[in-house]
C-alpha cells in the first residue's frame, strides 16, 4: 500500500515536470544561402543553428547511449549518408561500410582526429566524439567522399531542410548565444553571425537569416597529406580545411 507522503512527493514531481514542459518552446528560423547579393541557392539544407545559455549554465545533452537509435554515418555508393550529422558530446558514432569494397575513413583537421584504417564490406567502426567541435570526414581511398560531424554540448539545435526551415524544439526560455554553421560559408562570416537572443514562452522565431556562400571549394589531401592517386573523380573538392 502506498503511503500518503509518497503520494504527495510523487504528485509534486509530476506537477514540476508538467510545468517544465509547459515552459519549453519551439524556436524557428528560415535560412537563405546567397550565391550573390540577390541570388538564392535552390537548396538551403544542412545549415546548423544551435543555442547555448549566456549565463554559463551547463545543459547536459541526452547521451546517445540512451537513445534507441545510435547515430551513424553510412558509407554507400562512395558517399556518406547523411552528409551532415549533429550529435551530442559523448556520442559513439557508427561508420558502417555498405559498399562492396574497402573504405578508410579518417579525420585529421578540426574536431575529432582519427583513422579507422581499411575495413571491408559489411563491417563497421565506431568513433567516440568526446568533446565539442566540427570534424571533417573523408575516405583515404575515394577522394569524392566527404561528410561533417558536429558534436555539441547543448541539446538545443536544428538543421535546415531544402527550403531553409529550421526547428529547435524544447527550448527553455532565457538568454542564449545563437551560433550558425554552414559548409559553404567562410569561418569569419559565420563568426559574425553569432549573436545573443532571448527565447520567451510560447514560440520564438529568428526570422530570415541570410548566409553568403564562399568561393568554390578547393581540393583536399589524403590521410598522409598528399594528393590522391589518379584517376581522380570529376569533383574531388571540399570546403575545409
Named regions from a protein language model:
Residues 1-9:
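Bacterial N-terminal signal peptides that target proteins for export
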Residues 4, 22-23:
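Intrinsically disordered, low-complexity regions enriched in polar/acidic and amide residues
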Residues 9-15:
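Hydrophobic helical h-region of N-terminal Sec-dependent signal peptides
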Residues 17-19:
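N-terminal signal peptide c-region/cleavage motif recognized by signal peptidases
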Residues 23-241:
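Extracytoplasmic copper-binding redox domains, predominantly the cupredoxin/blue-copper superfamily
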